[in-house]
Amino acid sequence: MFQAETVCLKQIQSTLRCIDFSKECTIEITSRGLRFAVEESQSLQAHAFLDKSLFQTFNFQGDSDGDTYMFQTMISPLLQSLSIYTDGKERISTSAWDQPTVNIMHKRGVICKVQYNGPGCPFIWEVEEMAGYATACELLTMECEDDVDINRLASTLCTKIIMKSNWLYDALVELDNNMGENLIIHTSSQKSTFLLRCVGALSTTEIEYPNEKSVLESFETDSENTYSYRFSLIRHALKALQVGSKVNLRIDENGTLSIQIMLVGQEGLCTFVDFCIVPLDLVSEDEEEDEEEEPAESNQSDNNVLRNDPNYRGDAETEDEDS
């Protein structure tokens, strides 16, 4: 059984909106918090983590600390329900509600109760006001078809970069205007450079960051590396980069890219969103293998590329120490 209460509705909604691009969402509840995961095209997994510190009360009943609840549902109805209280202009036109902080929620007596009673039960979010109004959202849940591997990167990292998220956002938006299909990321340990390139039909655009503390808070790369990624997958991270504070870019030895973004709320509480993207060469290899397999076999092997690496590891909520 899981029960919790929170007044951080604005921050929770802003975080979950960053991964609201897939119909189905896998939710994992542990004693440390809630993790929401979505995926696309067997090449992208996005995770949003809500730490237990966002909740005023957090009651997770399990036999041990390692116990979890995992199920699938849709989060779009939940976001629509929360928008009644977080999108000020839709509810009331006062300036106070244009920026509904945690303190305002306390003053108005707005509190959200979250409940999940186990397999087969709905995932319930109920928002109550001191005035007596209440909004309940019951999300139907389904068992996960496969165990969702929440670990993302291999143990060996070849590149790690920490910078302001809005700087990366501005660069990606400019590159996206080039109408290219792929994003190329190049790092060099000798030249200490971090370069982004997009090749369009009419021109090529490059943006290079020098290894300076005023630009890159942290820059680590073991050698000269160049990887290419589908821009259509990178675009899913733009919403989080636009509202984020810092971004932690990591590339492992297989070329898998992790874009981990820290979102800081008005009360100083942090949430994390992580986008894990497979490079184009791995995507091509996986597609070729699917074409070579017999139809009967291919129907039995529809596994996500991101789950095939047994050395995958890393939790989004622990990266705030690095940031």
Swiss-Prot record:
Compositional bias segments (type: Polar residues): 297-306
Any Pfam family: Rad1
Residue ranges of the TM segments: none
Subcellular location: Nucleus
Record key words, sorted: DNA damage, DNA repair, Nucleus
Stretches for region Disordered: 284-323
Gene Ontology CC annotation, any one: checkpoint clamp complex
Principal subcellular localization: nucleus
Biased composition (Acidic residues): 284-296
GO biological process: DNA damage checkpoint signaling; DNA repair; meiotic G2/MI DNA replication checkpoint signaling; mitotic DNA replication checkpoint signaling; mitotic G2 DNA damage checkpoint signaling; mitotic intra-S DNA damage checkpoint signaling; telomere maintenance
SUPFAM superfamilies for the chain: DNA clamp (SSF55979)
Domain of life: Eukaryota
Family: Belongs to the rad1 family.
Function, in words: Recombinational reparation of DNA damages induced by UV and gamma radiation.
Protein name, UniProt field: DNA damage checkpoint control protein rad1
Organism: Schizosaccharomyces pombe (strain 972 / ATCC 24843)
Gene: rad1
